[in-house]
Amino acid sequence: MTDYRTQPINQKNADFVEQVADRIEEMQLEGRSLWQDAKRRFFRNKAAVASLIILAFIIIFITVAPWFFPFTYEDTDWNMMSAAPTMEGYHFFGTDASGRDLLVRTAIGGRISLLVGIAGAFISVTIGTIYGAISGYVGGKTDMLMMRFLEILSSFPFMFFVILLVTLFGQNIFLIFIAIGAIAWLGLARIVRGQTLSLKNKEFVEAAIVCGVPRRQIILKHIIPNVLGLVAVYASLEVPGLILFESFLSFLGLGTQEPMSSWGALLSDGAAQMEVSPWLLIFPAFFLCLTLFCFNFIGDGLRDALDPKDR
């Protein structure tokens, strides 16, 4: 026999469960909408999208271009030394004083420069984010000691550090990674620390503390995910600075070693022969400047897309 008194209650329970499910779905959608909104705003930025497309073509060029030519970055064409750009011999960007093809060397140099920029940014972002989050969340004497250590590193003469590494270990591309990674994370660590100081007083962090969640999990699962937007913007703006810095080191002769090259080293060689062989300076400078502009516009687009004031 059916108990009709239970039908309204069961119906209410069903309605309540349905409402809860709808609310959970809405909350999930709201959680995703932050990044979806940022994505939509980014792709509405024409300069950022155009820069992203151009940068993709540059990456494709430096990746596949050397495969389509019958010589490497160190091969010498004795019959085409200091040759201007020509279709003859497939030297579309010309050759240098040693008869080496500039197009292939520009592509290989682009690989080195982009690798230094992206790898250096990854190292600095990883160290800076973790260091800043720990310092800001733990606080107290630990925070004070970590910030004093940061100030000591910031006051250290960076060029002296690079020259010391080169003197002790010789010119090596890995030394550039070490040198850049040793100093580039300092600024981000301060920024992440400031964000962490404001985040650790939020309700969701306090709730995690009340539930007995360990500090490490709070930092990794609650603090760091909430600063990823800031970190992404910082990384996109850090890459061009690191590329430019590597080019500066190579221009001074402290970067890549012959016959390997980078855009900075090519600029140094081109500047020395600018009057007689201007193409040696024009092509590397064009790719370097174009890449720097692309990264800057992409960084500006990310910053605008993730800016909560504009939502």
Swiss-Prot record:
The keyword Oxidoreductase does not apply. It is a multi-pass membrane protein. One of its GO terms (biological process) is protein transport. Part of the ABC transporter complex OppABCDF involved in the uptake of oligopeptides. Probably responsible for the translocation of the substrate across the membrane. NCBIfam families: PRK15406.1. PANTHER family: OLIGOPEPTIDE TRANSPORT SYSTEM PERMEASE PROTEIN APPC, OLIGOPEPTIDE TRANSPORT SYSTEM PERMEASE PROTEIN OPPC. The complex is composed of two ATP-binding proteins (OppD and OppF), two transmembrane proteins (OppB and OppC) and a solute-binding protein (OppA). This is Oligopeptide transport system permease protein OppC.
